[in-house]
Amino acid sequence: MNELKQTWKTMLSEFQDQAELKQDQLFVLGCSTSEVAGSRIGTSGSVDIAESIYSGLAELREKTGIHLAFQCCEHLNRALVVEAETAKLFRLPTVSAVPVPKAGGAMASYAFKQMKSPVLVETIQADAGIDIGDTFIGMHLKPVAVPVRVSQNSLGSAHVTLARTRPKLIGGVRAVYECE
């Protein structure tokens, strides 16, 4: 577990170096703790793995002031666990469900228990996110998603994809994108 925590800490540090997350930005995590442990997604969730991943993100939140969203599994239609204040700030309508390990996933249910005032929302448009175990967070990212590459592309046995977003470049040949 110590190796997992160290890998995760390094991954988050490298991600922040590139994504440059700022206060009040929205971050989404999709995570299969089963995949991290080497099993097929949805088959053997782990509270211990969820705790390790959550603690790293809690540190990132403290350093940056970002808002965290934890994607549930497909049994809850990939709804997201957020703090009630996050839902209010981003004007996100809530939905009625409480994630549990077998319907929501180990990661989302762990996050729900750790938060001060957790709620579920159906969808968000996050500024950045990390997908651990191919949980498909793309539906919750703003357009345009930009891949972020870090020194490792796996956590435990799970494949990891990292992304930040950028504003759309609009206009034509005469458009200017940087101030002179």
From Swiss-Prot:
Induction: Negatively regulated by TnrA under nitrogen-limited conditions. Pfam families: DUF436. Signal peptide: none annotated. InterPro entries: Antibiotic_NAT-like, DUF436. Belongs to the UPF0340 family. This is UPF0340 protein YwlG. It comes from Bacillus subtilis (strain 168). The gene is ywlG.
